[in-house]
Amino acid sequence: MSNTIQPEALTFECETGNYHTFCPISCVSWLYQKIEDSFFLVIGTKTCGYFLQNAMGVMIFAEPRYAMAELEEGDISAKLNDYNELKRLCLQIKRDRNPSVIVWIGTCTTEIIKMDLEGLAPKLESEIGIPIVVARANGLDYAFTQGEDTVLAAMAARCPKQVLEVEKEAKNGIQKLLSFGRKKEEVAAEKSEYVNHPPLILFGSLPDPVVTQLTLELKKQGIKVSGWLPAKHYTELPVIEEGYYVAGVNPFLSRTATTLMRRRKCKLIGAPFPIGPDGSKAWIEKICSVFGIEPQGLVEREEQIWNNLEDYIQLIRGKSVFFMGDNLLEISLARFLIRCGMTCPEIGIPYMDKRYQKAELEMLEKTCQEMGVRLPKIIEKPDNYNQIQRIYELQPDLVITGMAHANPLEARGINTKWSVEFTFAQIHGFTNARDILELVTRPLRRNNALKDLGWDKLVKEEAKV
């Protein structure tokens, strides 16, 4: 008899627990490196400063392109003028670093004392002559990765509506220079590699090698990526006109997607996210279907990647994984791990936008049915106390959790993996699927190694709860 599970619907619950996630201002750590001509000014208290220093591990005298505008008692009691203080700091930044854009990051404190950053920015911008983008990344309203979402949503509103004539001439000049000495036929052949389709903009901050990989994967299908949000330089933000197509690469960018659709009148391609070979294939297929292109060689590409992952998959096949919820990548990671042969009883997630993640949820459902496993229960804003009771009952082989709960769970004999590592690792596209499994299997491999050494007391069987 086959153990096929009867088709059922995904169940959603909301426990309205507190956000137990990394602070969203941590988005500065990867965004300041991604946008090379930017300067990030975090407006908050000493606590925010300590967090940034510890979380980023960057020494202040290394002069990174971010800084803290530390609020003092005078700011909170309204004895100091916010505008004058911020003007003084921004002029200092302009003099020392001369960035193309200054990004103000609002924190919990600016939210509580009702600092009108959005009101101050336009006036100060016209006075100092540098664009000022305001993004709220407070931990009261947002989970870990949603800090990036607010920054990109603010930047989406700043994307130019049309290419300036000067820029057109400069681009044409560069293209002529690059094609100098090449035959006309070669240049024409390169242009003809692409199918004629409406412009496509991809949004989401990814490391440069991953950006190149995804761009090339689409190029193989004849699809040209007209631009990325964010670009490497603020001055190179993509032109976005009404009717352009946009696609996201991360599941936590729902606000950016909404801004692009409502304010910039773009058409969103609702696809699963390119995490794991299955997600990458589905993402490319969906973009191809929107443009009426028949995808080429994707089935073979996916099969080849799965064969390369088999050594890691053997370690996790038949094991269970439990997501406590932290970075909003949970649905995509669960879908990929279920495809690898794991079971997942519960997915905790701080915030769930069912419209933006619709395609991903449908793919999760389909994957569970194809693999013959039960659908996970999805819990939004989970209550940690209840969650830990469920972990004790279920005894999963691995818990993917925020840093705060990792050591207490390990002490009780439960294998854990920090969810924050998936945020900072390269996990998108076909070739990076191995990195996901490298992270997931590390605690399991460590325990196997300890068992082989005979150190049983350090392994979960001996742990006293």
Curated annotation (Swiss-Prot):
InterPro entries membership: LIPOR_BchN/ChlN, Nase/OxRdtase_comp1, Protochl_reductN
Q: What class of enzyme is it?
A: oxidoreductase
GO molecular function, a single term: 4 iron, 4 sulfur cluster binding
For binding [4Fe-4S] cluster, which residues are annotated in this chain's numbering? 23, 48, 108
- Which Gene Ontology terms describe the biological processes this protein takes part in? light-independent chlorophyll biosynthetic process; photosynthesis, dark reaction
Q: In which pathway does it act?
A: Porphyrin-containing compound metabolism; chlorophyll biosynthesis (light-independent)
Keyword Iron tagged: yes
Its required cofactor(s), as named, are: [4Fe-4S] cluster
Indicate whether 4Fe-4S appears among the record's keywords: yes
Instruction: Report keywords, A-Z.
Output: 4Fe-4S, ATP-binding, Chlorophyll biosynthesis, Iron, Iron-sulfur, Metal-binding, Nucleotide-binding, Oxidoreductase, Photosynthesis
- Supply the EC number(s): 1.3.7.7
Please share the entry's free-text remark on the cofactor: Binds 1 [4Fe-4S] cluster per heterodimer. The cluster is bound at the heterodimer interface by residues from both subunits.
Catalytic activities? chlorophyllide a + oxidized 2[4Fe-4S]-[ferredoxin] + 2 ADP + 2 phosphate = protochlorophyllide a + reduced 2[4Fe-4S]-[ferredoxin] + 2 ATP + 2 H2O
Please describe the quaternary structure of this protein.
Answer: Protochlorophyllide reductase is composed of three subunits; ChlL, ChlN and ChlB. Forms a heterotetramer of two ChlB and two ChlN subunits.
> Entry's PANTHER family?
LIGHT-INDEPENDENT PROTOCHLOROPHYLLIDE REDUCTASE SUBUNIT N
Q: Which family does it belong to?
A: Belongs to the BchN/ChlN family.
Give the protein's function: Component of the dark-operative protochlorophyllide reductase (DPOR) that uses Mg-ATP and reduced ferredoxin to reduce ring D of protochlorophyllide (Pchlide) to form chlorophyllide a (Chlide). This reaction is light-independent. The NB-protein (ChlN-ChlB) is the catalytic component of the complex.
Which protein are we looking at? Light-independent protochlorophyllide reductase subunit N
Lineage, highest ranks first: Bacteria, Bacillati, Cyanobacteriota, Cyanophyceae, Oscillatoriophycideae
